[in-house]
Amino acid sequence: MIDVVALGELLIDFAAKSTDSTGYPTMAANPGGAPGNFLAALNAYGRKTAFLGKVGNDAFGNLLLGTLNAAGIETRGIRVDDSVFTTLAFVTFDESGDRAFSFARKPGADTQLRWDEVDKSLIDEAKVFHFGTLSLTDEPVRTATQKAVAYAKMQGKLISCDPNLRLPLWPDEDAAKEQMLWSLHQADVVKISDNEVEFLWNCTPEEGADKLLTEFGVSLAMVTLGPDGCLLKTKTASFRAACPKVHPVDTTGAGDIFGGSAMARLLELDKSVSELTEDDLKFIGSFAATAASLSTEHSGGIPSIPEMDAVLKAMG
């Protein structure tokens, strides 16, 4: 049995590490993509996962497949395409470790996944179907994602969504908002950042969580607040978790690691989302906030996921 299957982008994050003797940046190639980071966190904390997506038949595609396999993620749902190159992201940082992105994705292999290439048996086997909005930027992967979500809902799967705003990948803000809002309407569990809440509704995290619960039919809203922790809310309970003090060097993948860690704890509880108590939300949120915070002390997405013992120790 698979706990979680995710559909979405796989890419290489090129992160500036230093400068050479001429002043040009040197960059590290880190395997990433939000759904892959999300699944890798789940695997790190004892869950079984599978990926649906596409990479190019190139060195970076091979690196991504090898990385996911090493993380224990089932990769039989990943297609390899000879005609397009694996997507690349270039990440730069400010003094606090926050990121700015540019992409080589015109097109990237992840955008070329077709519905007929999606391994539906992996959805059948899973308890949870997870997706983000970067697989809604372009065809044919947009249609593949929409049909996969509909299929998963028909099969009675728990639907998890991370809207994951990356404006450079959209033609304009309105297109991004349209697809993000569609995604949120599909989901039972949502992980969203305070910045994304502000982008969509220009409101506070608390107001955003309430919107998700009352207007979108979401059962569990999780709003990440950067260094201020997170807010978790259901219709009957809420909890706000703090983060441990860390010295961030790279926030790449921290939100994904939060989401995967939270989902791992939710699955450990083995109860309906509608039945979650405040203590349950503390069990989920405190662990996820700590795991995400610790990940920022290391570079990259998947390589930065902290071990379970390190998270529990930091929680005290």
Predicted segments, located by residue:
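Glycine-rich phosphate/pyrophosphate-binding beta-alpha loops
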Residues: 87, 133-137, 292, 298-301
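Conserved phosphate-binding/catalytic region of the ribokinase-like
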Residues: 1-5, 150, 205-316
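Glycine-rich phosphate/adenosyl-contacting loop at the front of the ribokinase-like
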Residues: 1-74
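Active-site metal-binding loops of divalent metal-dependent hydrolases
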Residues: 10, 134, 163, 257
